[in-house]
A protein has these predicted regions:
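Terminal substrate-recognition subdomain of acyl/acetyltransferases
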Residues: 1-104, 200, 204-211
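Metal-dependent nuclease catalytic cores in nucleic-acid-processing enzymes
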Residues: 188-204
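A conserved beta-strand-loop-helix scaffold within acyl/acetyltransferase catalytic domains
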Residues: 53-67, 73-183, 192, 197
Length: 211
């Protein structure tokens, strides 16, 4: 982390709080507020390479006392090959439409986000976001973002994934979907389709965190 040491950045630790992903676990984070600077993209890119993720206008990494289940990962897009389970997932969901959305956040996506959070993460801060906070989360001020949506055969939105764009790749920030589609592995489908899309674009890496 030599790059980070040279920036005179201020890192802070949170107190422990209930984990949104693993039941009966406590989470703690090391985080940094992103300063207003023309060098933000380089800073955010370096933080991402070191395992940090964005949330609103800060970057964080889990530093939990008794758990290390959240593992930062960097997927080499060029070397990525579909596994048997990946192929099964694509076959199960071959009726779905995956496409890039270039517009602003719409009401349909926000309502889907609320439905997902209320079902999966009802006790988390994200479950209580209003629409302005949601848009601030999706469209931050210090780097570009892309949103990919998934639609069913009736053209109803059933899932979305938010990805930040960095110098050497993309970072999967957050994904959500209709809870009733969980058995079809829509969360996994969003990642697989994102990887295949980035492969077409010759994007080097996809950063994410495995839970």
């Amino acid at each position: 982390m030599d790059f980070l040491k040279n920036k005179n950045l201020i890192f802070r630790r949170t107190l422990s709080f209930n984990c949104s992903y693993l039941p009966k676990k406590m989470e703690k984070r090391l985080y940094i507020n992103i300063p207003k600077s023309t060098d933000n993209q380089n800073l955010v890119s370096e933080l991402t390479k070191n395992g940090f993720r964005r949330s609103f206008d800060h970057m964080y990494i889990p530093i939990c006392d008794s758990c290390n289940m959240c593992i930062p990962s960097r997927i080499n897009i060029k070397k990525f090959k579909l596994s048997k389970s990946n192929k099964r997932n694509l076959k199960i969901n071959q009726d779905l439409i995956f496409k890039l959305d270039l517009g602003k956040t719409n009401n349909e996506r926000y309502e889907l986000f609320k439905e997902y959070c209320n079902t999966r993460h009802n006790d988390s801060q994200m479950a209580h976001m209003n629409k302005d906070e949601f848009e601030s989360f999706f469209y931050n001020k210090f780097n570009k973002t892309n949103i990919y949506d998934v639609f069913d055969s009736s053209n109803s939105l059933i899932g979305s994934i938010l990805m930040d764009i960095f110098i050497d790749g993309y970072s999967a920030i957050y994904s959500f979907f209709k809870p009733q589609f969980k058995k079809r592995g829509i969360g996994k489908y969003l990642i697989i389709r994102s990887i295949l899309e980035l492969k077409v674009q010759n994007i080097p890496y996809l950063y994410s965190i495995k839970y």
